[in-house]
Amino acid sequence: MREKIRLNSSAGTGHFYTTDKNKRTMPEKMEIKKYDPVVRKHVVYKEGKIK
């Protein structure tokens, strides 16, 4: 089953992306480099829960 997740910026800007992932095939926490428009550069985004 695909679950919705939130990708939080590690730059501390409060910016986030929402996406989904398959928990069965990828049980570990997701970390991916994406663009943060607040600091205008690519930073690591880490998985967090949607509240």
From Swiss-Prot:
NCBIfam families xref list: PRK00595.1, rpmG_bact
Organism: Cellvibrio japonicus (strain Ueda107)
Pfam family, one: Ribosomal_L33
Disulfide topology: none
Keywords tagged on the record: Ribonucleoprotein, Ribosomal protein
Name of the protein described by the UniProt record: Large ribosomal subunit protein bL33
Recorded GO MF terms: structural constituent of ribosome
Disordered: annotated span: 1-24
Coiled coil: none
HAMAP family per record: Ribosomal_bL33
Protein family: Belongs to the bacterial ribosomal protein bL33 family.
UniProt GO BP: translation
The gene coding this protein: rpmG
Cellular component annotations (GO), alphabetically ordered: cytosolic large ribosomal subunit
